[in-house]
Amino acid sequence: MSSQQQLGLVAPPLGLGEVDHVRSLSDNLNALLLSDNYQDITLIVENHRIPAHKIILASRSEYFRALLFGGLLESQKSEIELKGISAAAFHVLLKYVYTGYVSLSSMKEELVKDLLGLAHQYAFPELEQSVSDYLKSILSQTNMCLVYDVANLYQLRALMEACRQYADKHATDILQSEAFLQLSPGTLCDLLQRDSFCVAEIEIFRAVLRWWHHNSYDDCIVKEDTTNELNSVLKSVRLPLITLSELLNEVRPSHLVSSDVILDALKFRTESRDSDLPYRGQLMPEVNVAHSRLGAQVLQGEMRTALLDGETTNYDMERGFTRHPIEDGNAGIVVRLGQPSIINHIKVLLWDRDMRSYSYFIEVSMDQRDWVRVVDYSNYHCRSWQRVYFPQRVVRFIRIVGTHNTVNKVFHVVSLEAYYSPVVVRLEKELIVPKHNVATIQLSACVVEGVSRSRNALLNGDTKNYDWDSGYTCHQLGSGAIVVQLAQPYVVSSMRLLLWDCDDRRYSFYVEVSTNNRDWITVCDRSRQPCQSWQSISFAPQPVVYVRIVGTQNTANDVFHCVHFECPAQEDGNGFEDVVVSTPQLPVDAPLSNPSPLVVADAATPPVPPPLPDHFSNFNPRPLDRERRNLEEEEEINLPIRFTVGSLTSQRSPRQ
């Protein structure tokens, strides 16, 4: 029984149990500020004498706490002069100290800027954050440069980033504004050095020239410090991006850049690959820039209209994809973005209405002549959604070239998307090294061989709801296997699987991996160990597309059952320790036409399991009639049994 019940108290109506007189407290403290009562300190700002109360100042700010009660000389004074600050802004700050209230929208922008400086100087972090948020919301072409300077001065990174993003979207207007001429050299360099400040380089040079003439004290007498400032700003101008005509007719006559520097720029442009030039591009985080509404176009490929329309569900054997024949010298499918864009992530949906796999590579370019290969999966089997990452670069053209189709000689792409993603992804030889499970239906992994009432029960993430009849994938011992295909190659070093454990039976098994469904390498051999429930596996990092789980023993019958598979292992405290298996590494760049000498098993001739160890002799291997009946029922309802890649050759493909 609660204390209220013991005393016979009744719970009050909602809202009556709380007393909130904060507004009255604020009004009373404001009245105290305006009165002459109890004041014990006078602050002098721009010859204005401002009475205040030490204890209130100290309670609101660490700066004033140290100044007034920290044992400094000022602690003994009744008057303290605060130099180099605005009296008007300090009055606003003092009102905030006493009341916690400021009306920023009723203040002039210059006063708001001064208040931000005081909040930073006198350690009022909440006020600093609020003023910063307000300034972000009112950024315009007239005030962005002023706000950017203040944010740079106080190193307010969030506000600086907001100014940068605004400048990126309005680059041309910012360069032509009068406020641009007021930028400090440091802020100007910070603005121009960024790849995402995308405007013609000659326009940037012209704006810098205007800025220099506006800020130089005398065109004939140039001081050393201003010369250093000019040099630092000029280094932010990318002269190799300016045409020869503009260099000779505008840059050289300005006398801001020496002839040697101009010649160096010309030499760099002449001798460098186009892909090595320091291009600028638009930056639109998490926005698909390869979309027709942003001006992207398909320049090459058959049935071009489908690729960039954003439709990723309504496609079949007749429509909804773009294609090209797989043949030597084919230029593939080429997309031109609406604007040069900074990207580091491309998503591709390969046609996936059957179990076929493709191989391909992706190249990018700025001039459609000099191509840089950012992804090369020509030695790997890939299917459905492809999510590839690479170091960010400025791109205007994207080319995807199919090199292999397990069914025919045509490469089919349903959708192509290009992004800049802030997500940090670890890469090893162009392959993603994932932290999270990639053997999921959401990431387009699938089971290509095995028996189950639900094709992808092994990958649906359900590790609780399984019994004698459902929730597992299986295969007959000595015949076939359970094979999982990931959507694309990943570099992994661990796996985890859940063996069916509704009774005390034990299994033995081994696990192999492959990148092409032909060359296999063993990463775990537990064919001589009795295993139950969760199995965690660790091995040397390997490129993996296919995972083959082969059961070799079941102490209850002749069927191997697996409930769940994940890769890499997502440990959740199940009590199992990783078993490290020393494994030779399959070369990432091993050609499909040259089988690796590391092959320990071939898809057509699975290895013969070793003889049973002595510790299995106590178990009765007689099959349980119930499980035999379940397996036969699954066959009768036409479930996908051993749905291998090889069987796809007899199925229909998209019409050519």
Set out the residue ranges of the language-model regions.
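Hydrophobic/aromatic beta-strand segments within beta-rich folds
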Residues: 295, 330-337, 342-349, 362, ...
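Alpha-helical scaffold in the C-terminal half of BTB/POZ domains
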Residues: 2-11, 50-52, 59-60, 75-77, ...
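Short active-site loop/helix that positions an aromatic residue
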Residues: 56-68
